[in-house]
């Protein structure tokens, strides 16, 4: 099993797909890395040589991935919250940040529905 950037890549996947298991590397970046290193995208990870793995390792180190990327994102959000801008306040309140409506929808960001006590029904007329 190849270990790149602290992530064990699945042995039976193609290299192109296996690299996307690293946080911060999607399909497009994976294709760029493979073109840069000259590794065939269709080979399986178990078939890679040690030279291929070390080439991939050095190519991935050029990007911010995994813990560094997560830390950078959290620092950016914390900076927005510290300066007290609109986006920072929305992050702090757990609401959508990019201008989406919240009267309806936005359930992912706001969490599950809360039940609110409704008013009592009027007594039935006789």
UniProtKB/Swiss-Prot annotation:
Keywords, sorted A to Z: Ribonucleoprotein, Ribosomal protein, RNA-binding, rRNA-binding, tRNA-binding
Repressor listed as a keyword: no
Biased composition (Basic residues): 100-126
Gene Ontology biological process terms, A to Z: translation
GO molecular-function terms, A-Z: rRNA binding; structural constituent of ribosome; tRNA binding
SUPFAM superfamilies assigned: S13-like H2TH domain (SSF46946)
Gene Ontology CC entries for this record: cytosol; small ribosomal subunit
tRNA-binding keyword on record: yes
Transmembrane segments: none
Region annotated Disordered, chain positions: 92-126
Stored NCBIfam families: uS13_bact (TIGR03631)
Biological role: Located at the top of the head of the 30S subunit, it contacts several helices of the 16S rRNA. In the 70S ribosome it contacts the 23S rRNA (bridge B1a) and protein L5 of the 50S subunit (bridge B1b), connecting the 2 subunits; these bridges are implicated in subunit movement. Contacts the tRNAs in the A and P-sites.
Assembly and interaction partners: Part of the 30S ribosomal subunit. Forms a loose heterodimer with protein S19. Forms two bridges to the 50S subunit in the 70S ribosome.
HAMAP family reported for this sequence: Ribosomal_uS13 (MF_01315)
Database matches in PANTHER family: 30S RIBOSOMAL PROTEIN S13/40S RIBOSOMAL PROTEIN S18, SMALL RIBOSOMAL SUBUNIT PROTEIN US13M
Protein family per UniProt: Belongs to the universal ribosomal protein uS13 family.
Name of the featured protein: Small ribosomal subunit protein uS13
